[in-house]
Amino acid sequence: VPVDPTNMLDTMYNFATSTTVYDPYGNTHTATIAFRKRPDLPEQVDAATGLPIPGTGVRNQWEYYMMLDGASLGQVPGTQIAVGGGFLQFTDDGKLIAATSGSFEAQPGGVGPDGQPLPAGPPRLVPQPVDPASGVPQFAVPFNGEEPIILGVHLGDGFNPDDPTDPRTGLDGITQFAGRYNVLRTSADGNPSGSLDNIYVESDGTVTGVFDSGYTRPIGRIVLTKFDNSGKL
């Protein structure tokens, strides 16, 4: 089934998992990451030499999509909308090599044999560079139809199977093994909205606020000083 990012159905992907994320106001939303296996294809053959062309085959590759309910994006509630996605590459023994970023782009329709224009095809996921500062795929999410904020997705640290000195294992995040799909752990940063419930002052003068959401953070600092003879102040 072709992927339609404006109306993602469960027939368009193999597996999915969800986690809670927060908009700029602290409201909670459910973000779902869905995974779709790409068909394994053999390498193309050079017609002149009869030899396989390296890098032309597809093996152990997946696409993934970040989806939110339309209500979270100021659109039709109950509709799963993909705000972006990317590509996963694994080794034959299931280790992650790379998790890259991608965006959806419309496919032009072209012109038919009779010279008449053909309708545009469904949007296609195309690779995009990963943000070098964060090192993880990032997606612009327009919560409630407002100015987009950036959400990053860390699926694991891929490793280089051709470099024996690479300290990364490719096993710290998502993997591809035989057996049933299983989610061991997900986490997300961010916090819900909360009201200031209590404050306390650290020994260095830092004023820490405790919010009823359970979140704790520094909110100020008091300048402290010490006098040798406080009685002469």
Identify the residue ranges that each predicted region occupies.
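S/T-rich, low-complexity, solvent-exposed segments of bacterial secretion/appendage proteins
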Residues: 1-233
